[in-house]
Amino acid sequence: MFYLKGVCRLNQNKTIGIVGYEIGNPQISDDKLCSTEGMKVLRFTEPVNALEHFKMNRNDYALIISDLRMPVINGMQLLKTIKDLNPSTRTVLTTDFDYDSKLIQDYTKKQIINGMLQKPIQPHELVTEVDKQIDIIKSTNKK
């Protein structure tokens, strides 16, 4: 099994939000992502529902992982709105497209997108990226 390392040491921001259909597939289950106490994983298939929940709980989120292609709001629009509401929330965009797009590069430079995952996503790749983002949060919180 894959576990997030050291997540229980976070004093705040204890929620990981996963938005999209394919990211929420059973292959990448919550127990592989987060069985360390102190963290929870919330999954949303609809980006509008995810955004509404985030607006009400913006200080609880450590990380949002979003698919690029979704109905109503695409992943880049969602992550930009997330960053506008809480710039300290880490963000990861997933896509099955080549991410050499100028807009994706621009969003990455501006720290709107903090990480990228190319589909198909293997469970260990997701866990590694989540660990990386959590480590950044922990090092930022120490400052």
Model regions and ranges:
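Acidic, metal-coordinating helix/loop segments flanking the phosphotransfer/catalytic sites
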Residues: 43-63
